[in-house]
């Protein structure tokens, strides 16, 4: 019995992606005339027959690239490795495969494209964690690869993105502290360093305003430089609030260590809440109240969107907010 020729077989022969072959055979834009002619000629020579729509849906598989900046892997190693594993599992469920590229800071600064794109190894791309706008624009301008942003967004670039509801999560945490009797509440995170920190800060501010409070600048503590995420030592204010809302669990654990080092006990003297519900063992000596990010749903949504883009055109669906879950533990005291 003769072997059934698939689009992936043609793609392998010409060292292009399956999406390129699909576009060429269906006369879609995004493929040069020369490459289109090569693909069609080879398809005839190999005896390729276009499958029915039902057969195509069942058999189609894709190579999905994931790029993540190296500083995210270094600083948030466990969180982003877990997110990558979730992407992997979501891809396997959709008959697809994932390849990871860690982008170093020098290549990002020099606008050197990812190898996965330069070598045409992938059919679609998930950008995980965030890259500088200039780099994202370079990718969008030079490559027609379907793309989804995961765990960040960039308002300067029209692209599909999947993010946790940072604003609502931080708003919920701050409201919880007010409900526990706290009136003097600080925030830890460098505002404008990342979109997620800024959104979490704004959720904190909304709660303050609704409770008749204004922001005290000395209670908003930077935790990193403004470039993005080179962490820096922060100084506690002279006049202390009774609670801190932290932009992530890792930073919350650092705040708790600094408080303990200075002589404060958590939650007896100061209450602390985090964000993410992802903290590897040994970083914190107390179970932390936090807002859990739904990594499974975020990853599944990103893969589903990307596959839809790879099979159904380039129409943008915008931002997808994935709700998380408030988790009460032992890092907050009622006063």
Task: Locate predicted features.
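Alpha-helical recognition/docking segments in bacterial nutrient-uptake
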Residues: 1-5, 59-175, 234-239
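Hinge/beta->alpha junction and helix N-cap segments in small-molecule ligand-binding domains
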Residues: 69-82, 100-108, 162-172, 188-231, ...
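N-terminal helix-turn-helix DNA-binding module of bacterial transcription factors
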Residues: 1-60
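Short helix-capping segments at alpha-helix termini
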Residues: 93-94, 208-215, 238-239, 261-266
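Flexible loop/turn connectors
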Residues: 231-335
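Short acidic/polar active-site loop segments enriched in Thr and Asp
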Residues: 17, 49, 123, 182-185, ...
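Short acidic capping loops at alpha-helix termini that bridge into adjacent secondary structure
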Residues: 183-184, 215-218, 266-272
